[in-house]
């Protein structure tokens, strides 16, 4: 089975505007997952998402806020962190937050933010197509102690999803040395 599973908080419910209250409810919900997760032996890797999707998908956007959330749960044997370059590349405090995360780093997802993206969910670029310095982010992850796999996560409805899968894999392999 899986060693860990990526989880998100979810966004604000319809009609809700109190971000702080929703974060507190999310924290309460994750507290209820501690014992079932511990019993299963599967760690939960909490993933902050880009602030552009905060309303509907996640009420936590910065790695520092995710770490505060994990600190409040106080169960590093159960919870860790998933870092998605697409979601956190813009955070000027990211390097310090990754150092703070240290052994709680469980997953690392990479893609690229296109300069003129048309859809924040389904218009991701392949590493090297946009503005994210994935190589630097990987170095920060490794400096913080991360030794896991780098997962290329391309949600690209109008581009990469329409290509031959073998070509997509070849592109990833061709670009890994330069951009990852």
Regions found by a protein language model. Give the residues of each.
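Active-site acidic/histidine proton-transfer and metal-coordination neighborhood
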Residues: 1-80, 90-92
